[in-house]
Amino acid sequence: HPRYNEVAERGLFIRDSETDAPEHSSFWDDEGSNLDFTNPQTVAWWQEGVTTQLLEMGIDSTWNDNNEFEVWDGEARCHGFGREIAIKHIRPVMPLLMMRASLEAQQRFAPEKRPYLISRSGCAGMQRYVQTWSGDNRTSWDTLRYNTRMGLGMSLSGLYNVGHDVGGFSGDKPDAELFVRWVQNGVMHPRFTIHSWNDDHTVNEPWMYPGVTPAIRSAIELRYRLLPYFYTLLWQAHADDEPMLRPTFLDHEHDAQTFAECDDFLLGRNILVAS
């Protein structure tokens, strides 16, 4: 990275357990070092970059990615806001501190706007700051089914602002029927995005199959008509911890059939989504 040496000289990385050098961890096909967001100077450096390189350039939200903090040296040392601590004790907290730093930068830059952020990684509490998704899923009917169930579990666990990469992120492109069904399912989730890096070098796009484009358009139009409802659900989730995606048994526990294996779910209390 062009600014790696600068950051290392300023001591903004998590440090190796045996030296004061930055820790080195495997990243993709090489090595890298992780920023230490328990160091106030790191937070300030990050926020300056978010502001000058993104927000001032017209990009008004942040996608906090590759933030699992897979530091292989569990004893690697973190600043700990003045009380040094090993990364193994606070690993899940690091992405939370990262997204909070991004949130604060956006709030300071545009205090009149409600900030929108995404994070790939995190833990309980991340719903205070960001929207998230199920990660790099693979194109298949099974993925569509199990992503839906994963989203319900996340919603019941407090991570209510969730969704999945519609059509699958990796693998070959979806066929027309799978793509339509995935879009129809996806528009009923808090996060709806068609996002891909297909193995066959194609790109998932709403118009990729002209024969089903009208069905795709209809589903997306429904999404826009439901925006006031989504807005209300998001407020209720924020204020009262109300799950946006709800297994049918959550509101109908006296109906034994709702406990049978089923892919249907409720969007809020009032819309039943047949899957």
Regions picked out by a protein language model, each given a short descriptive name:
Residues 1-275:
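Catalytic-domain carbohydrate-binding cleft regions of carbohydrate-active enzymes
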